[in-house]
Amino acid sequence: MNENQFNEAMQQIVDALKKRGYNPYEQLTGYVKENNPTYITRHNGARDRIQTLDFERVKQFVNSMRG
């Protein structure tokens, strides 16, 4: 998966979290800290999608959200 595909997948996950009223940073941080997919909504397949992504890249993405 190239960088653009990864970023698109992460944006879809962030959008799904927002649509369900969650704070994406908090939910993704919980997912990374606990390695627990229940932090990610099932809405629009977000939970299934995040589990297909490289965990280290997800951690880097979450760290980049901090600013």
Language-model regions: role of each:
Residues 1-67:
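Intrinsically disordered, low-complexity, basic-enriched segments
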